[in-house]
Amino acid sequence: MYPAHLLLLLAVCVSLLGASAIPPLPLNLAQFALVIKCADKGKRPRWHYMDYGCYCGPGGSGTPVDELDRCCKTHDECYAQAEKKGCYPKLTMYSYYCGGDGPYCNSKTECQRFVCDCDVRAADCFARYPYNNKNYNINTSKRCE
C-alpha cells in the first residue's frame, strides 16, 4: 500500500474516533431545528436558540428576558405537559410538512401530535419576534434569578 493511502486511512480513523466522543442531539431536537427553519424561512441559524435568554437552551428559570425567550419558556412548559401525558418529547419523532405558511403537523399518535404541536407553536412564535443579540449567551446566574 502506498504511504499516501495509509495517511488517508489514518486520518479517516482518527476523525471517526474524535466524532464518536461528541454526544448526538436527541432526535426530536434535531427535528425541531428543521421545524424552526421552516417557520422562519431560514432567517436565523438554529444555534441562535440554544443559548438565548433564560429559557432557550437546557434548563430555564426566572423571568424571560423578552418575547422570544417567553416562546422558549412556553415550549418548556409544553414539553412538561407532554411528559405528564407519558410522552417523551425529546425523543418523540413526528410527521409534519413544511407548507407555504409554515410547518403543519400530520402525526397520527397522541404523543406525536402533542409534541409536534409544541414544536410548531414555538417555531411560529420564534418567527414572530425579533432576535436581540444582547440576550444571547447571557449570565443566567445574574439575569435569570
UniProtKB/Swiss-Prot annotation:
Q: Which residues form a coiled coil?
A: none
Q: Give disulfide pairs as residue numbers.
A: 38-98, 54-144, 56-72, 71-125, 78-118, 87-111, 105-116
Swiss-Prot/TrEMBL keywords:
Calcium, Disulfide bond, Hydrolase, Lipid degradation, Lipid metabolism, Metal-binding, Secreted, Signal
Renumbered to this chain, the signal peptide range is 1-21
Please name the SMART domains in this protein's record.
Answer: PA2c (SM00085)
State any GO BP term from the record: phospholipid metabolic process
Q: Which residues form the active site?
A: 75, 119
**Where does the UniProt annotation locate this protein?**
Secreted
Any Pfam family the entry gives: Phospholip_A2_1
Q: Which family does it belong to?
A: Belongs to the phospholipase A2 family. Group I subfamily. D49 sub-subfamily.
Q: What is this protein called?
A: Basic phospholipase A2 PC10
Q: Per the UniProt entry, what species is this protein from, by scientific name?
A: Laticauda laticaudata (Blue-ringed sea krait)
What broad taxonomic lineage does this protein's source fall under? Answer: Eukaryota, Metazoa, Chordata, Craniata, Vertebrata
